[in-house]
Design a protein with these regions (language model features):
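Short Pro-Cys-Gly-centered "Cys-loop" motif that presents a nucleophilic cysteine in a tight turn
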Residues: 1-52, 56, 65-189
Length: 189
C-alpha cells in the first residue's frame, strides 16, 4: 500500500529520482541535454516552476513549485519520456527509475535555501567536480542568465550574486535533505 505524499502549504517540493539499482541514467552529455529538453517541456506542460536542479550520474534533484498533483504529472511526463528515450537509445527494456520519485515538502525560506544549496553542492559532495564548475546544475543560472529556473523569488533572498556565492562557499556539512537524514521521514511512494 502506498503512503500518501506529504503536502506542502507553500507548494514547493524537493524531488529526487534514482536509476534502478543505482544504475547510470546519464551515459553522456547528449543524454543530459535530452533530459533537460524533456524536463523543460514537462514543466511548461504542467505550469510548474523550477527553482533548482542537478543531474548526477545515477539520479537527479529538482526543486519545483507547483501543487502536488501537477508535480506528479510533471514527473510522469519527465521520467516516462526520458526512460523511453534512454531505452531506445541503448537498446534496453524495463524500468529506468527505481520506484516512484521521492518528494519532500519545503515550507519556509530557510529550508528552501538549504535545499538549493544541497542540490547545487551534490557534485562536490560526490567528489565529481567543484559545484561552481559543474555544468549540469542550476548554480550558474543564479549568477548569469536563467535558462530553466524561475529565480526571481529566490534571488530576492540574497543581496546579490556575491551573497549567493558566499552562501554556497560558506557551507558546512550540516544540511540534511531528502537524500540524507530526512529520507526516513519523507514519503517514499
Amino acid at each position: 500500500m502506498r503512503i500518501p505524499r506529504r503536502q506542502s502549504e507553500a507548494d514547493v517540493y524537493h524531488v529526487l529520482a534514482r536509476g534502478t539499482g543505482r544504475q547510470l541514467i546519464f551515459e553522456d552529455d547528449a543524454d543530459r541535454r535530452e533530459f533537460l529538453s524533456i524536463m523543460e517541456d514537462s514543466l511548461v506542460r504542467t505550469a510548474a516552476e523550477l527553482y533548482a536542479w542537478c543531474l548526477m550520474g545515477n539520479h537527479f534533484h529538482l526543486l519545483i513549485h507547483a501543487p502536488l498533483e501537477r508535480i506528479s504529472e510533471c514527473m510522469r511526463l519527465l521520467c516516462g519520456g526520458y526512460a523511453r528515450y534512454f531505452n531506445e537509445k541503448y537498446g534496453r527494456v524495463g524500468h529506468l527509475f527505481q520506484e516512484r520519485f521521492k518528494s519532500e515538502p519545503v515550507e519556509d525560506d530557510g529550508y528552501l535555501l538549504t535545499v538549493i544549496r544541497y542540490i547545487h553542492l551534490n557534485p562536490s559532495e560526490a567528489a565529481i567536480a567543484d559545484f561552481n564548475e559543474y555544468a549540469w546544475s542550476s548554480y550558474g543560472e543564479y549568477l548569469g542568465s536563467p535558462r530553466y529556473c524561475s529565480i526571481d523569488d529566490v534571488e530576492g533572498l540574497f543581496a546579490g550574486p556575491q551573497d549567493y556565492r558566499a552562501f554556497h562557499e560558506g557551507y558546512a556539512r550540516t544540511d540534511e535533505c531528502l537524500e540524507v537524514g530526512r529520507l526516513r521521514n519523507a514519503t517514499r511512494s
